[in-house]
Regions:
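N-terminal capping/small domains of soluble enzymes
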Residues: 1-133, 141
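Glycine-rich phosphate/ribose-binding loops and adjacent secondary-structure elements
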Residues: 133-214
Length: 214
């Protein structure tokens, strides 16, 4: 069997998947609403999960996704506390494999009327994305943040912590100590259109090389 259950450590409603393969976060804006809807339908048929990505949750993907993971990112564009309660899991993003330790750039050409409304941004203007969360700064604060998210969701859903492939041994240990149900390890092969080439090509470690120390 390929069934996987995630979140049995604390969550009242662990995430149950038929296959151990999921779709990582891709933002609304980089993808259209219909593409997000199609991914939701696909994962529902396959029995796995998809992830919101930057910019928040769209009604299309929530309506079609049996299992939807809500990403809580440092820059909080499109973050809606009510959507946290609609998610089947929450992923606190500390790092991204394609740009560990770095923020990003949301190009103005991606900011349509709808994207601008969801993210509370001016249309057509480039926006830099922060690399640090505004309300916590270290592992002790992360523990408090995870508890806050559990209270918001009434301890129902698993809390993931996503780390970049940089210091897998130490970062995994800190995430577990902070109370994460799942640690998501993102290696340098991950792609992004929202950072400099020097990050994409030269920073981070491959996923397979990170698994053993993690």
């Amino acid at each position: 069997t390929t069934n996987v259950t995630l979140g049995t450590r604390y969550a009242k409603k662990p995430l149950e998947l038929d296959i151990p393969i999921t779709i990582a976060g891709m933002s609304f804006g980089a993808l259209s609403g219909s593409a997000k809807e199609a991914l939701g339908r696909g994962v529902s048929i396959a029995g796995t999960s998809t992830t919101t990505g930057d910019g928040g949750m769209t009604p299309e993907e929530r309506g079609q996704s049996k299992n939807l993971i809500y990403q809580l990112l440092p820059y909080r564009y499109g973050m809606n506390p009510n959507d946290l309660r609609k998610a089947d899991a929450i992923e606190v993003v500390i790092g991204q494999g394609a740009k560990p330790g770095g923020g990003g750039m949301l190009l103005g050409q991606k900011i349509s009327d709808r994207v601008a409304e969801m993210r509370t941004l001016p249309k057509g203007v480039d926006q830099r994305s922060a690399c640090r969360h505004p309300d916590w700064t270290g592992p002790d604060d992360l523990k408090i943040k995870i508890l806050e998210l559990r209270e918001i969701t009434k301890w129902k859903v698993p809390i993931f912590v996503k780390i970049a492939g940089a210091r897998p041994y130490y970062d995994t240990a800190l995430a577990i100590k902070a109370g994460a149900d799942v640690v998501v390890l993102d290696g340098m092969q991950g792609g992004t259109a929202a950072t400099q080439e020097v990050f994409i090509e030269n920073v981070g470690q491959p996923t397979l090389g990170c698994i053993r120390p993690a």
